[in-house]
Curated annotation (Swiss-Prot):
Gene Ontology MF annotations: ribosomal large subunit binding
Job description of the protein: Responsible for the release of ribosomes from messenger RNA at the termination of protein biosynthesis. May increase the efficiency of translation by recycling ribosomes from one round of translation to another.
Similarity comment: family membership: Belongs to the RRF family.
Gene3D superfamilies, A to Z: 3.30.1360.40, Ribosome-recycling factor
Source species taxonomy: Bacteria, Pseudomonadati, Pseudomonadota, Gammaproteobacteria, Moraxellales
Major subcellular site: cytoplasm
Localization per Swiss-Prot or TrEMBL: Cytoplasm
Protein name: Ribosome-recycling factor
Length: 184
């Protein structure tokens, strides 16, 4: 029972780390990466769909993405969706869509760093909330006399160690992202 709680908490914390990585992927660094356009939604036959479902996104060079729509009729809709996204990108349209990424200014890098820190802080809060939920479950098991006080205390210490491990991992990933952002 206690082991199930530990495994469940560890799985939930791992999902939080995966979510953090997805959040970090949206933070633009100086280099082109297809995941920059992951959040762009394109109108397609009456509903909004992710860009990667209507086009291939590739890298032309270190500062340029290439978007090749599966259907030629989608070029203008994709162009418009990229322009209207909050990414500040201006695509160049021909048969395919080229998306040059402007060089990041120092100010933009600082703003991106703030966004990355915010994502990391949200991940830490989520991890701590998972810990709180599991500790609450342990307390209710103790109250129902399904586990002893010693078991509850030992399991609580184990959960704290797991939490510390994942919070340290969030800090490590944030430091790596900040270093990547500040690299010119």
């Amino acid at each position: 029972m206690i082991n199930d709680l530990k495994k469940d908490s560890e799985q939930r914390m791992q999902k939080t780390l995966e979510s953090l990585e997805q959040g970090f992927a949206k933070v633009r660094t100086g280099r082109a990466h297809p995941s920059i356009l992951n959040g762009v939604m394109v109108p397609y036959y009456g509903s909004d769909v992710p860009l990667n479902q209507v086009a291939n996104v590739g890298i032309e060079d270190s500062r340029t993405l290439v978007v090749q729509p599966f259907e030629r009729t989608m070029v203008s809709a994709i162009d418009k969706a990229i322009r209207e996204s909050d990414l500040g990108l201006n695509p160049i349209t021909a048969d395919s869509i080229r998306v040059p990424l402007p060089a990041l200014t120092e100010e933009t890098r600082r703003d991106m760093q703030k966004v990355a820190r915010s994502e990391a802080e949200n991940a830490k809060v989520a991890i701590r909330n998972i810990r709180r939920d599991v500790l609450g479950d342990l307390k209710s098991l103790l109250k129902d006399k399904e586990i002893s006080e010693d078991d509850e205390r030992r399991a609580g210490d184990d959960i704290q160690k797991i939490t510390d491990k994942y919070v340290a991992e969030v800090d490590k990933r944030l430091a790596a992202k900040e270093a990547e952002l500040m690299k010119v």
